[in-house]
Amino acid sequence: MDLFGDLPEPERSPRPAAGKEAQKGPLLFDDLPPASSTDSGSGGPLLFDDLPPASSGDSGSLATSISQMVKTEGKGAKRKTSEEEKNGSEELVEKKVCKASSVIFGLKGYVAERKGEREEMQDAHVILNDITEECRPPSSLITRVSYFAVFDGHGGIRASKFAAQNLHQNLIRKFPKGDVISVEKTVKRCLLDTFKHTDEEFLKQASSQKPAWKDGSTATCVLAVDNILYIANLGDSRAILCRYNEESQKHAALSLSKEHNPTQYEERMRIQKAGGNVRDGRVLGVLEVSRSIGDGQYKRCGVTSVPDIRRCQLTPNDRFILLACDGLFKVFTPEEAVNFILSCLEDEKIQTREGKSAADARYEAACNRLANKAVQRGSADNVTVMVVRIGH
């Protein structure tokens, strides 16, 4: 099964004049200079024929997070200047690169989490806006690396917490260094090795306990290498890209990830070939996902830690990335979630706190309001909403 494919890039049309800009709503990136188009080339053939065209709006995703975990937001990111620390706010800026007149779009993550009706928070998340220095990539090929991830634990908090604390560390250690012939192939191999190694580490630790841990976790990670997104996921947590279509003058929800559940044909066939079975839509009638980190008792039954990996070229029409676990999408469709966030970003009544830009305040409010609304709509699961702002 092909694990790596391109998400389609929309056809370019001239950016709208001032009149059209007004139809898109107020300017949300007033602290950012306008970006020029990225030179992305013609691209290769579409390898995933199940992906919707960029203009379609089918896709969604929910993110989850652990309250007990040591927060890693911004950990590993470049240190702020004394002035930024004083203001308590880090401006999102574009990283301009002197090659092919390209512009690296700035990325900044925001998150909100709610325990909901569950007894404990079993979700975890990681926001690393810039880990370029830690990855030490080939300077001539890569100028910016960012990492965002959500993990939805089940059977306990240990697998999701372990993945949140260790997956990006393993990724940094395995990230390509020195001479690289193909960045994309090398990054793909790096992600596959990282997931395999992290799962093996957790299973080794889990099996050494008495009694053995039975925790498991989904994983949805977005690795940004310059303006290319690499999305790796296990299970039913999802990543969604909000992209503006200039022809229709509407925003679309583009799915960046693929859900893994035992009822899907390929997943069920793999489980059955390994000696397992699917009952009531679950592995052995118990486990709801067919790929995960942990879940040692199900790994011999065909459950795997091999992620689906997809690639997406960022464009000037991209607004934000939504990462979330199924707690959100039990009560929100992807389109509803994207439109809810957009309405918050256009709300001029949102108060700007001291030390924060208007854009920061709106994105934080969007995360909090969406998480609250999911709980109000009756989501019985933990709810975590992560939104990654794309600077223009």
From Swiss-Prot:
Tissues of expression: Widely expressed. Highest levels expressed in striated muscle. Much lower levels evident in various smooth muscle tissues.
Amino-acid positions noted as binding Mn(2+) 1 in the UniProt annotation, renumbered to this chain: D152, G153
Superkingdom per UniProt: Eukaryota
Compartment list:
Cytoplasm
Question: Ranges for the PPM-type phosphatase domain?
Answer: 108-390
**Annotated S-S bridges:** none
What cellular component terms from Gene Ontology apply here? cytoplasm
N-acetylmethionine found at: M1
| Residues found modified as N6-acetyllysine | K210
A molecular function (GO) term: protein serine/threonine phosphatase activity
Q: Which PROSITE patterns match?
A: PPM_1, PPM_2
Outcome when changing H154D: Loss of >90% of activity
The annotated regions of Polar residues compositional bias extend over 56-70
Q: Does the keyword Nucleotide-binding apply?
A: no
What is the activity-regulation note?
Inhibited rather than stimulated by magnesium.
As recorded in UniProt, coiled-coil segments are none
**Residue numbers bearing the Phosphoserine modification:** S13
Quote the function comment for this protein: Protein phosphatase that may play a role in regulation of cell cycle progression via dephosphorylation of its substrates whose appropriate phosphorylation states might be crucial for cell proliferation. Selectively associates with integrin linked kinase (ILK), to modulate cell adhesion and growth factor signaling. Inhibits the ILK-GSK3B signaling axis and may play an important role in inhibiting oncogenic transformation.
Q: How does it assemble?
A: Interacts with ILK. Specific association with ILK is independent of the catalytic activity of either partner.
Please state what the protein is called: Integrin-linked kinase-associated serine/threonine phosphatase 2C
Q: Which organism is it from?
A: Homo sapiens (Human)
What are the top taxonomic ranks of the organism?
Answer: Eukaryota, Metazoa, Chordata, Craniata, Vertebrata
